[in-house]
Amino acid sequence: MLRTSATAAPRSPRRALVPVAVAALSASLVAAPAAAETAQAPAFDSYVSLGDSFVAGPLIREERVSSSMPLLGCLRTSNNYPTMLAERMGITDFTDASCSGAVVNDLYEPQFDDTPPQLDALTPETDLVTVGISGNDFGFSEVLLECAKQSLSNPLGDPCAEHYGDELDQRVEDLRPEVAGVYADIAERSPDATVLAVGYLQILPESRGCWPSTPIAWGDVPFLDRAQTALNAMIAEEAEARGAVFVDVFERGHDVCQSSDTRWVEGLIPENGAPVHPNFLGMRATADFVGAELGVPAPVDDAA
């Protein structure tokens, strides 16, 4: 049975052990067929992925064998977590409608001339939906660029917090009805679907940061971290109120200030992926978290 997160609070470091534990458990069940029968993941026939660039995965290099190329208009890669998840679950009726730069309105209107509204991908037969949306409506990119500019004047202070004041909290509250509407409309179009609202990976650490490689003033790092936590919490509340399951992927220790073999989100000068976006490791970790919510164990090589 799917479990529903009660809160969008940051993960304890112990949660990092979840994919490993799931993989170990699945291995032990191979030797016990009777037990395995009771632990099988639910089967899905028709999966639709909706969302923005944290779903689409712009500019992630092909680090695994794939026959498909990124969709250039939406900068959608075959290395994103929905594609990984569909492959792990053996789902062949899979539509990835996610698109870089998408805002909530792009779920209802064409984002480009040749890109239909994302919600058009849903049908009454759709039985699995993952969603990641509202980061662009909140203005992640604009806020980070403004804070980078502000940091030049006072890298040890909190100039961005002074610049925005309570505005970011208000942005989160203003987005509530839009996010609520998305999950209500998904339920109406695909009433039998299991719907998972996927949160945003941690971008910045809790404190200090790594100025100047990521030019956010030390005092502004916790300010922005709290803003992202508030956005994830709002998404969780509105999605769960409409029958969706929130998947908390906000696990600390994988932010832009970490080394390339540890971070899940790239910094302003990326090595694999777009600036301040998930990299391959981040997408793989997200697939692990979503899979665990569905009872799908991570591949053994992922958990190693």
Residues covered by each model-derived region:
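Catalytic His-Asp segment of secreted/periplasmic serine-dependent ester chemistry enzymes
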Residues: 201-303
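A structural motif corresponding to the C-terminal end of an alpha-helix
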Residues: 84-93, 177-195, 230-248
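Short, well-structured alpha-helical segments in soluble
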Residues: 108-125
